[in-house]
């Protein structure tokens, strides 16, 4: 499988780039975290599997989602919201892995937000579908 970061030029040794007020492209920043994040993702999804949520209008979202941390983002007929309880398991969302926290706080610091402390993480899984 091709490396998406290489295709997009995100792994290249180039300086960070401000792309809009308050938004910075941190090329290659996450690469040192990949192995730890993927391992931790397996632990998170074992407790809170990916699912296709429903919009308030009844459409099933194409992206599969899960959450970790103190709250999780939800979408269903009742609307969009954050909740501390996973509606599919009836339990709290899994704790946010330390490597997720390190990635988020490091990226925020490099982007100019040194005081950022992550408390929730929405994880999206996009899958390729052939048109038609």
Show the residue positions of the predicted features.
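Non-heme Fe(II) oxygenase metal-center motifs and adjacent flexible, charged/small-residue loops
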Residues: 1-132
């Amino acid at each position: 499988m091709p490396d998406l970061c290489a295709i997009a030029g995100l792994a290249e040794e180039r300086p960070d780039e401000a792309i809009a007020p308050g938004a910075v492209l941190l090329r290659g920043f996450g690469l040192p975290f990949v192995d730890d994040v993927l391992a931790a993702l397996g632990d998170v999804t074992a407790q809170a599997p990916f699912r296709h949520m429903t919009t308030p209008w009844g459409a099933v979202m194409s992206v599969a989602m899960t959450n970790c941390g103190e709250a999780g983002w939800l979408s269903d007929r009742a609307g969009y919201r954050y909740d501390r309880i996973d509606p599919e398991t009836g339990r709290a969302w899994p704790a946010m892995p330390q490597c997720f926290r390190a990635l988020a706080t490091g990226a925020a610091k490099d982007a100019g937000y040194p005081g950022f402390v992550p408390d929730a993480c929405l994880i999206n899984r996009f899958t390729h579908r052939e048109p038609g």
